[in-house]
Design a protein with these regions (language model features):
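Alpha-helical interaction elements in eukaryotic regulators
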Residues: 12, 37, 67-70
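Short intrinsically disordered terminal tails
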Residues: 1, 100-101
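N-terminal beta-loop-helix "entrance" segment that forms/cooperates
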Residues: 37-44
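A short beta-strand-loop structural module common to alpha/beta enzyme folds
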Residues: 26-36
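Structural micro-motif
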Residues: 44-55, 68
């Protein structure tokens, strides 16, 4: 599952959510409602922008994907390699090959 920390009025957050919906990728949006929450997640996740996107790799562990541009890049690479069938497994595989070196 992809987990996103999002702001309701953020166009990048909306783009990331739309991309996941269009590709039928299982995800959960956590809406950040207050400035206090925003500052907490920025500090906790060590990211200054939104959306903050993570991939669940097992029951208790999540891997940071990054922001909207990172998600778009990974999905586009998956599509170029695997065609229109983008799955959570293919995103994980591409992420590992693109960023874990």
């Amino acid at each position: 599952m992809i987990v996103l920390y999002v702001l309701r009025t953020c166009p990048y957050c909306n783009s990331a959510l739309q991309l996941l919906k269009e590709n039928k990728i299982k995800h959960k949006a956590i809406y950040v409602e207050t400035n206090e929450e925003k500052e907490l997640y920025k500090k906790q996740n060590r990211m200054n922008t939104f959306p903050q996107i993570f991939m669940q790799v097992d029951r208790d562990n999540y891997m940071k994907v990054g922001g909207c541009d990172d998600l778009i890049e990974i999905v586009n690479v998956c599509k170029s390699v695997r065609g229109s069938n983008v799955s959570l497994d293919s995103i994980y595989y591409m992420y590992q090959n693109m960023y874990s070196k």
